[in-house]
Amino acid sequence: MKQPGQQTVNKGETYQIEITDMTHDGEGVGRVDDFAVFVPEALPGDVVLARVISVKKTYARALIEKILTKSNQRITPVCQKAEWCGGCQLAHMDYKHQLAWKQRYVEEALNRLGKIETKVLPIIGMENPEGYRNKSQFPVGFADSKLVMGFFQKRSHQIVDTDHCRIQHPLINKAFQSVKQVLRDLRVEPYNEINHSGVIRHVVIRVSFCNHALMIVFVTRTDDFPHRDELITCLTKELPEPASVYQNINSKV
């Protein structure tokens, strides 16, 4: 006879799971015969058919095959790439419930984990929960015979090539588009994770809410950066906002 919390699922098999909670990083939590199963993109109130992809001693992870009953927290993401892109974890959850989840997460971190008995005041939400992210990091790669730049696909290192992100500050979107086009025009070679060739690993862009100044950081494999001066000159012309440009060397293989 299985004891509560003992393994009752098998890798590769599909189970009907009612989602009752969420982890700190936004994965749904359900149980199969009292054995915890974490399900990415699932929300409390969902009932899903999910295929188990890994089994540990005290929990398993599964991916949604089909949503049988939709949670009242679930919405259709506005972004058409949300299904694949790893840039947003809760694009499928309505904003009111996002705030409630974050509120509870802070309360649990302080009261249950930190043993600090204190009252957490309600989170002050935004009137429009878009355009607020003032720092983004974009991996750079090569696909379909061209340089690509965007966000890693969920659970992979495949890059979702994009030109716009709704939650980023508009100036980051503008700078992002300019940087990608200039890198393509100058034929700067992206870093290749397989053979460790190429130069550009990531581009980090940050904007100040105070004066709208931009900071652009090129994370490179080596100090040698072909077309570096040309790149800076082109960006200076493309971006009228005050901008600073840095190079961060990461030679780690």
Regions found by a protein language model. Give the residues of each.
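Accessory RNA-recognition modules of RNA-modification enzymes
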Residues: K2-V253
